[in-house]
């Protein structure tokens, strides 16, 4: 996919979501690096989303994953000292509903505080599980649709007080060997060290 100028909020979310799909397929296939198949997925999805021929999947899928994952910290995989965390902080307009709530251990919850999820991810220097990023993107998209922000220019949103930081949406992802789908995959890694 050739570099193209992304101006609108909608295009930025679509680009981030298409790159997420690319990463998702590579992690699912346990690839060490991205290949032409992954790039093709990204290009087709981005084009399909832009042209209105494809849609982002429903948050219902993410709710099913949340229920299947069970009571673990969705960030680190810990089963200790769990609480509910708002993905979009209520302080900045995040809703108090199931779609915006996930389990978080005391340590991650305290570390994240009222920060934007992507801001917190960047400060940690470690990518979050892909399913959490996917949920974040879907919440961002829904918020923008509901508040008539989806067709705005990106710079119009950067100074607004929103429950997300539009300029921090991930548009590139690390190599698949450094990514995980869900926090539960980290539990075994914790005991190896």
Where are these regions (language model features)?
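Short, charged surface segments at domain edges that flank catalytic/cofactor-binding sites
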Residues: 22-72, 131-138, 142-149
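Nuclease and nuclease-like effector domains acting on nucleic acids or nucleotide cofactors
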Residues: 1-52, 174-193
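A broadly tuned "polar low-complexity/structure-edge" signature
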Residues: 5, 11-19, 103, 110, ...
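Generic preference for hydrophobic/aromatic residues in regular secondary structure cores
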Residues: 12-15, 20, 82, 139-144, ...
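Intrinsically disordered, low-complexity segments enriched in small/polar residues
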Residues: 12-15, 73, 118, 171
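Histidine-centered nuclease catalytic patch
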Residues: 72-128
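Detector for Asparagine
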Residues: 19, 38, 55, 74, ...
